[in-house]
Curated annotation (Swiss-Prot):
CDD domains assigned to the protein according to its UniProt record, in alphabetical order: BTB_POZ_SKP1 (cd18322)
Pathway per the UniProt entry: Protein modification; protein ubiquitination
One Gene Ontology molecular-function label: cullin family protein binding
SUPFAM superfamilies for this protein: POZ domain, Skp1 dimerisation domain-like
Protein name (database record): E3 ubiquitin ligase complex SCF subunit sconC
Gene3D superfamilies referenced in this protein's UniProt entry, alphabetically: Potassium Channel Kv1.1, Chain A
GO cellular component, one term: CBF3 complex
InterPro entries xref list: SKP1, SKP1-like, SKP1-like_dim_sf, SKP1/BTB/POZ_sf, Skp1_comp_dimer, Skp1_comp_POZ
Region: Interaction with the F-box domain of F-box proteins, residue numbers: 100-158
Signal peptide: none
C-alpha cells in the first residue's frame, strides 16, 4: 500500500494511505501532478485536528464507489444520513463547520454533503428564533423589517 504525507496548516505531517487521501479530488490531482515524488503535500487551509478527522472519514469511506452525476439529484433531495456518519458528525459546532470548510477545500463532495445535511437537520422544523439560538446568531432586523419579511413570504408558511 502506497502512502502519502500531508502537511497540515499548523505544520504537522500526517502519513496516510494513498487510496484514502485520494478521496479528496484536490489531493488526487496534486498527486497526479507530482508523479512519483515522495514530497509532502501541503494542506494550508486545514489544521491537524480537522485533517485527522477528515482522514478518519475518508478511511471509513475509502471503498465507497465514486459519486456519479446521476445520484446527485436524489442525494440532494434527502437529508438522510447513515448511522456511522451521524455518529461521526456528533461534534461541537466549530468542528462541524471546520469539517465542512475542509471538505469543500479538499473537494470531498460526499463529506461536504454529510456536513451540510447535518446542519440542515439542525435547522429543520425550527423557527427563526430557535435557529438564531442554535447557531448563536444576532437578530439585526427591526420589528418593522421582520413584519415586512413575514408578509413577503406568507406563501412559504402555507
Amino acid at each position: 500500500m502506497t502512502t502519502v504525507t500531508l502537511t497540515s496548516s499548523d505544520g504537522v505531517d500526517i502519513t496516510v494511505d494513498r487510496d484514502v487521501a485520494e478521496r479528496s479530488i484536490l489531493i488526487k490531482n496534486m498527486l497526479e501532478d507530482l508523479g512519483e515524488s515522495d514530497e509532502a503535500i501541503p494542506i494550508p487551509n486545514v489544521n491537524e485536528v480537522v485533517l485527522k478527522k477528515v482522514i478518519e472519514w475518508c478511511t471509513h469511506h475509502k471503498n465507497d464507489p465514486p459519486s456519479t452525476g446521476d445520484d446527485d439529484d436524489s442525494r440532494r433531495k434527502t437529508t438522510d444520513i447513515d448511522e456511522w456518519d451521524q455518529k461521526f458528525m456528533q461534534v461541537d459546532q466549530e468542528m462541524l463547520f471546520e469539517i465542512i470548510l475542509a471538505a469543500n477545500y479538499l473537494d470531498i463532495k460526499a463529506l461536504l454533503d454529510v456536513g451540510c445535511k447535518t446542519v440542515a437537520n439542525m435547522i429543520k422544523g425550527k423557527s427563526p428564533e430557535e435557529i438564531r439560538k442554535t447557531f448563536n446568531i444576532q437578530n439585526d432586523f427591526t420589528p418593522e423589517e421582520e413584519d415586512q419579511i413575514r408578509r413577503e413570504n406568507e406563501w412559504a408558511e402555507e
